[in-house]
């Protein structure tokens, strides 16, 4: 029996893991991986129902901090390998630039995947992306959600090119 429309519980799938095509998907270790898993969930759900689905960017926002912590460790290790001494503030600043790049890549992945997906029932997924800043608790997670929303809106405004590159 086919379902019509759903609010995808991405938060549960991302925080607790999920199963896609008989494969256990663990909690993502980065924002971009969380975005990829989200698009896989969208594809699977769209292939087994008719009607739209809604996802919330607030469910992806906590993974910005996961990436931030990982990138801080990586920057620190890189600097130590090159015998470059930086303050924590400098390391955080470099890591934050990389966080922004990762947000850009993750959002771009969602954009391209949702636009180009074709489901097994022959239709493109109809996806509503919820961008409600109040859904995240005040503090770093809300600030991260604001960055994700800003990037999503900027990419939507820029649009994507068609097959002719226009």
Where in this protein do the model-derived segments appear?
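Catalytic alpha/beta active-site cores
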Residues: 1-166
């Amino acid at each position: 029996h086919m379902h019509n429309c759903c609010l995808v519980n991405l938060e549960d799938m991302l925080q607790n893991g999920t199963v896609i095509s008989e494969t256990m998907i663990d909690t993502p270790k980065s924002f971009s991986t969380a975005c990829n898993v989200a698009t896989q969930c969208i594809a699977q759900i769209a292939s087994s129902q008719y009607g739209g689905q809604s996802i919330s960017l607030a469910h992806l926002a906590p993974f910005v901090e996961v990436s931030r912590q990982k990138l801080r460790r990586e920057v620190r290790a890189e600097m130590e390998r090159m015998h470059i001494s930086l303050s924590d503030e400098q390391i955080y600043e470099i890591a934050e630039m990389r966080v922004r790049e990762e947000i850009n890549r993750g959002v771009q992945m969602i954009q391209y995947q949702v636009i180009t997906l074709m489901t097994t029932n022959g239709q493109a997924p109809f996806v509503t992306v919820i961008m409600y800043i109040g859904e995240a608790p005040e503090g770093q997670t809300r600030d991260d959600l604001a960055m994700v929303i800003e990037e999503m809106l900027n990419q939507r405004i820029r649009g994507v090119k068609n097959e002719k590159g226009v």
